[in-house]
Structure formats: C-alpha cells, structure tokens
C-alpha cells in the first residue's frame, strides 16, 4: 500500500491531490489543511469523481490532524501564504518559514521515513530550510520548481514550433524565479533535432524570455498564482518516486560541490526513484551557462540569508 500526503488544500495542493488520484499514483492520498472543512470537502468532491473518471485511489481530508498522515511514503508541502502588496521578501520568508518548518516537523513525527517534496515559496529557500532544520539525508528533500519551469519551457517551445508539447525535450536549471532560472535552449530538441536548427536565434530568445516570466504572466492574467501546472508538476515528481521510474527531472536539491556550488538548494537535473534523489546529473555547461548558474546561485544564497535574519535558522 502506498500513501501520499499533501499538506495545504489550496489551489495547488488540491490540484496535486487530484492528479495523484486520477493517475492512481498511490493507493491513498491524504490532504491536510489548517482551515476547518476545506480538505474534507475537497476530498469528498474528488471521491465523487472516482466513478466518472475511473480511478481507485482513496482520497481523504483532515484538519490539522497529523496522525492521519502516518506512514506516508511521500509528503508534498504546499503550505504558506502568497506575497501580499507591500510585503517585503523578508516578511514573506519569515511567515512561510515558520509554517513550512512546523509542517515538516509534524509530518516527521508520524512518517519518519517520508520523502518530502517542497512546493511552498520561495521554493529553493523553503527546500533549504527543510533540509537544514530537519537534518534529513539530502536525497529525501526535493524542491519541485525545475519540473514546473521545464514544463513551461516545453509549452512555449511547442507553441513556437507548432507541435505537441510531448514531442519536445527541454530543461530549465537554476533558481525557481523569473530572474534566476536558466532555460537551456542549447539542449532543447524536437524529435531528436536541436531546436536551435528549427527556430531563429531571435525566436528562441523569445521562448526563453516567455518561460522566465511564465509564472508572472499567469499571475497577471489570473489575479493570483497559477495552480494547474504547479500541482501537476508536484504530482509528476511524486509519481517518479513512488513508482521508482528513474526519470531525469530538474529539481531543487542540496549541492555539495556539484556545478561548483555548495550549501544551497537549487535546480539541477536529478534521477528520481524510490529513494528520492537517486543521483545528481552534472551537465557539461558552456562558459555562458556556467556564469548564469553562478549568478543564480548568488541570488539564491542571498534569499537564504533572510532565514537567519528572521531567526528561522
């Protein structure tokens, strides 16, 4: 019997749980939220689609009852608040760090062997906080960001090529932010053909730019953060772990010298399997890509410093 818990039954968490159920990734999915009745109601709503959609996964909800999350194989953390107008980066980190730290500690009381998938923002920093505050092996703490950014990159590539997104390969590394992510256009392919041979340099740069502001574009259109793709990206990461698929997925993981960086969590390609991070894959980067990655790492380190400023670490 496999079990996944999703903490936070908001838009992203509920979407993640729904995708996990629909794809029958686990036998049981538990949603936990602090708001009375929300996770229970959404779980019931999802279960009423089981006959319509043909899935056998059991989805349940609970209000702050961590005992019901016991013996989870993977736990997805989506908890936290969005940045409000006038709120500084440090204030957002201060609030969300407290929430994520508390959630992670409570989860481990009942699921000491769980693998954690962090979606809460700022994602690289919350992944780093979870790792440092819990003292778990680094293979068990994974930030989802690169999976989402890469999916957005493939979407924009497919739009430019006029093809199906499933026929495109593309990868985004670096920090999960609109100035820190690095879409690797050089390595993108369509049916094995380098995209650089199919699109002009100008068009490819447009795709890269659109990818980098992908989240902000959706926030502007929706009036809030996106949820379908982030939730699905979280479920995609979980599926590779639960089913031991050994997929190569860019995720935010703790580096100890890889890519010339240490003591931070940042997006790089990893092999995901039953142990979480099975392997960090080191790509041969160009001088320009190395420079961009180093700049991205500096920005992530700077955000991590705020954890000390607010007393979270």
Language-model features: where?
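Glycine-rich Rossmann-fold phosphate-binding loop(s) that bind the pyrophosphate
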Residues: 9-10
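Conserved N-terminal Rossmann-fold NAD(P) cofactor-binding segment
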Residues: 32-72, 301-310
């Amino acid at each position: 019997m496999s079990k996944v818990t999703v903490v936070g039954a908001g838009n992203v968490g509920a979407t993640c749980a729904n995708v996990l159920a629909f794809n029958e990734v686990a036998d049981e999915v538990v949603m936990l939220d602090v708001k009375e009745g929300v996770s229970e109601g959404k779980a019931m709503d999802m279960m009423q689609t089981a006959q319509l959609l043909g899935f056998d996964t059991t989805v349940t909800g609970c209000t702050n009852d961590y005992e019901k999350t016991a013996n989870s194989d993977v736990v997805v953390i989506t908890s936290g608040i969005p940045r409000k107008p006038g709120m500084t980066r440090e204030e957002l980190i201060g609030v969300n760090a407290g929430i994520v730290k508390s959630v992670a500690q409570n989860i481990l009381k009942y699921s000491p062997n769980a693998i954690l998938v962090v979606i809460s923002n700022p994602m690289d920093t919350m992944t780093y906080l979870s790792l440092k505050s819990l003292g778990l092996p680094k293979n068990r703490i994974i930030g989802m960001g690169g999976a989402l950014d890469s999916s957005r990159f493939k979407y924009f590539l497919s739009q430019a090529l006029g093809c199906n997104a499933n026929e495109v390969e593309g990868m985004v590394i670096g920090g999960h932010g609109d100035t820190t992510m690095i879409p690797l256009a050089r390595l993108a392919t369509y049916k094995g053909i380098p995209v650089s041979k199919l699109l002009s340099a100008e068009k490819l740069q447009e795709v890269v730019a659109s990818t980098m502001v992908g989240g902000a574009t959706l926030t502007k259109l929706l009036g809030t953060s996106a949820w379908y793709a982030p939730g699905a990206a979280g479920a995609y990461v979980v599926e590779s772990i639960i089913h031991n698929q050994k997929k190569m997925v860019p995720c935010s993981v703790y580096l100890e010298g890889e890519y010339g960086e240490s003591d931070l969590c940042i997006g790089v390609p990893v092999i995901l399997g039953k142990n979480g991070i099975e392997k960090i894959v080191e790509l041969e980067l160009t001088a320009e890509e190395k420079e961009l990655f180093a700049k991205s790492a500096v920005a992530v380190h700077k955000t991590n410093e705020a954890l000390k400023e607010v007393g979270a670490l």
